[in-house]
From Swiss-Prot:
It is an enzyme of class 5 (isomerase). One of its GO terms (biological process) is glycolytic process. This is 2,3-bisphosphoglycerate-independent phosphoglycerate mutase. Catalyzes the interconversion of 2-phosphoglycerate and 3-phosphoglycerate. It comes from Saccharolobus islandicus (strain M.14.25 / Kamchatka #1) (Sulfolobus islandicus). The keyword Membrane does not apply. Belongs to the BPG-independent phosphoglycerate mutase family. A-PGAM subfamily.
Length: 414
């Protein structure tokens, strides 16, 4: 029996709701999708709950689920995955945080949570922080640059805990929060104290940085604080190949996703020009996926642009991103050959563009199979048509479904 290559494409934050600017259509409905439409003749579509109905997924928990790992078992927090994706090497006992370079005033009130989002000087600022803040109370501190405004911070030492609260207030106009212990333990209290000292030290370093002085002179907001959230102890994950028997690779520019994929043992590729944002190089991602499919059984392609547009409320940009993803799908199918490939296209969660945040809505999902199946008689691939399809699954079902239709699944039982 022929075993097929598997391509899983995730458009981050793909799912949406009717949008007033689109006369009640969703971005997926409004987008022109000729390549996807061409696959419908041999596809099943439907809806997926990344975690379970009504649960609002993070990109971390949803991807764990989609890769076949129950987040209720394996998820400890996002910080460790962000750090791994940003290039950190973690060991047992380390505590990692995800964070943003942000702008605050002298009273530590947040002016811009992302310091303008695009931060070309991020590497310089991380280097300066690492040179000037090496250790607090015998705990080593290390900063790692992520994409755009993002940064990861790793604490290494004895007697530290991830049971501490965020310093990120999550809204502008609010003061940077004081980290507090989330459990009654010496380790949590000590870690919170270290984080609060770190917050002040980071502000002192960045507020006097020559980099930020230049930014102010150029009319840009200074990146003069790091807002921390998502504390997580490092937890070792099983390798993807250990439970799927697949040689796997991933294409992504987003630190969180790269971190998860690397921890799963996938070969992670970030093509030149891939940014993890709206301005990513779609063609470079398509070419990378094509090359990886030559040597791997499973290739995961992650595109963040749809989610970035949604969080910023950019309706037209989300529609354009979907149309560019459609071209990516067409390019890959044309090069690899539709007879050699199982292709799944979905989102990791919904991010309605008028809400600007994740929601617990189910996400449309498409599964293309190159051999005769009972396909779904639908006219398009979108949230409304997906309700007519045969698939109604959870994220945890995805990996097993892909193994089954690629003729790679093993029988369960005698």
């Amino acid at each position: 029996m022929k075993q097929y290559k598997i391509l899983l494409i995730i458009a981050d934050g793909l799912g949406d709701r009717p949008v007033s600017k689109l006369n009640g259509l969703t971005p997926l409905e409004a987008a022109n999708k000729p390549a996807i439409s061409d696959l419908l003749k041999s596809s099943m579509i439907g809806l997926m709950d990344p975690i379970s109905p009504g649960v609002i997924p993070g990109s971390d928990t949803s991807h764990l689920s989609i890769f076949g790992l129950d987040p209720h078992v394996y998820y400890r927090g996002r910080g460790a995955f962000e750090a791994l994706g940003a290039g950190a090497t973690l060991k047992h006992g380390d505590v990692a945080f995800r964070g943003n370079f942000a702008t605050v005033n002298n009273d530590l009130v947040v002016v811009d949570r992302r310091a303008g989002r695009k931060l070309e000087e991020g590497e310089e600022l991380v280097k300066e922080l690492n040179e000037k803040i090496k250790e607090i109370n015998d705990v080593k501190i290390r900063f790692y640059k992520g994409t755009e405004h993002r940064v990861a911070v790793v604490l290494s030492g004895k007697g530290i805990s991830d049971k501490v609260s965020d310093t990120d207030p999550h809204y502008e106009g609010l003061k940077v929060l004081e980290s507090k212990p989330l459990e009654d333990s010496t380790e949590a209290l000590r870690t919170a104290e270290i984080i609060n000292i770190l917050t002040r030290k980071v502000f002192d370093v960045l507020n006097s940085s020559e980099v930020n002085k230049r930014r102010i002179e150029q009319g840009e907001k200074p990146a003069n604080i790091v807002l921390l959230r998502g504390a997580a102890h490092y937890v070792k994950l099983p390798s993807f190949s250990s439970y799927t028997k697949l040689k796997a690779a991933a294409v992504s520019a987003t630190a969180l996703i790269k971190g998860i994929c690397r921890e799963l043992g996938m070969n992670v590729v970030t093509p030149v020009g891939a940014t993890g944002g709206i301005d990513t190089n779609y063609n470079a991602k398509a070419k990378a996926a094509i090359e990886l499919l030559k040597e791997n059984d499973f290739v995961f392609l992650h595109i963040k642009a749809t989610d970035a547009a949604s969080h910023d409320g950019l309706v037209e940009e989300k529609v354009k991103a979907i149309e560019r993803i459609d071209k990516v799908i067409g390019t890959i199918v044309d090069n690899v050959g539709r007879d050699n490939l199982i292709l799944m296209f979905t989102g990791d969660h919904a991010t309605p563009v008028e809400v600007k945040e994740h929601s617990g809505d189910p996400v449309p999902i498409l599964l293309y199979v190159p051999y005769p199946i009972i396909n779904d008689n639908v006219k398009d691939f979108n949230e409304k048509e997906a309700r007519k399809g045969s698939l109604r699954i959870r994220g945890l079902d995805v990996t097993n479904i892909l193994l089954n239709y690629s003729n790679r699944a093993e029988k369960y039982g005698a």
